[in-house]
Amino acid sequence: FYCFAQPVAQGANAYLAAQGSALRAADITGVTGQGLLQYLRGGDPVIVWITKDLSAPRTGGCTWLLADTGETYVPYVNLHCVVLAGWDGDTCTIADPLQGRRRVDAAAFLQCFRQMGSRAVVVH
């Protein structure tokens, strides 16, 4: 199972408010590569949805029946969520919960990010 940006931002905001923090999370789905770079320059890492190996998104294997809409959903089988932590020319630094901090090709990252719907959350 997984979720995308909106419920992550909502959950983060509930937690931040409960902690008395002035920080807030925002669903910035649709942000451009330039927009991501602006958040990073401002010191704000960004949670992004990509694939495990920056390959094209794949679906299949099963279907989900969404209880609230009755729709059938075919889930991604290689979906992954990481924190975009830096950008230096042709490479991006991501904090990957499976592989730790690593550098990836910026063009491949952006292509995958766009293919996954440019989904992102920033906390600032």
List where the protein language model places each region:
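Structural recognition of the beta-strand scaffold that forms the well-ordered cores
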Residues: A25, V46-W49, V83, T93-A95
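Noncatalytic regulatory segments and standalone regulatory/sensor domains
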Residues: R41, L54-C81, A85-H124
